[in-house]
């Protein structure tokens, strides 16, 4: 498989069939430009939650912003119960309905048909980005599937179930980033998947107390009995010995996933390799912080300080 592909060609080099496009009118050009501008504004307003966006090459910033706006809006519906700024908090059923509407709008935009006015700017930008970079619609639908699961699923019976959730909630983002940069090969995808899943898991082990307050427990239930853990243990102010042992087990197997993805940055050009390396180091350091607290994420949420972030930047730069 070619390392780098023309976004309008398949990995084998064959030109992909596309329907003949109509010549863009000034109106559609302006609508698309305005859609991207709104996506960029949303992304910039959330730089604290999406710092890697600052390092994206200028030519890719509109496309990355379109992907971010899509994911952010759907996540807000699922997690915050808000489908528009200043809107009322949605019930569980209303969230599911709006997520179905969002999925329908994605499919409608695929056909070049109008989408709901409140989301038209998002799907205008996403449709244009998908066409330019040949991004599979399945990756966007996987994200929506995971957001829908956030509304209805609060416990995970097995680690395999949790991995499947991460496959849809985290891995598509890494694959989209690679595709936007022109990389489309299975080896990089597998390594990216390992990093993205590990990042998602690291966040779970960091946020055990935070998630409990939201009614969620991501620690697989199959491991509770093994370490003598009960659901009530997650409501305590400090972690029991069983919870600590269980989280130690989760942290160690998450490190194994980070190790699987470790070769990825070396196969990528600057600045993408730097971005991925910083991301990898950040997730690994979160696991270090969980371990440094003796695996007690109930007592206090492990975080990275300013000095930690400076060290990550230096390590990321000099390890390339």
Where are these regions (language model features)?
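Intrinsic disorder/low-complexity segments
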Residues: 1-26
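Catalytic cores of Mg2+-dependent Asp-rich isoprenoid enzymes
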Residues: 26-200, 205, 209-320
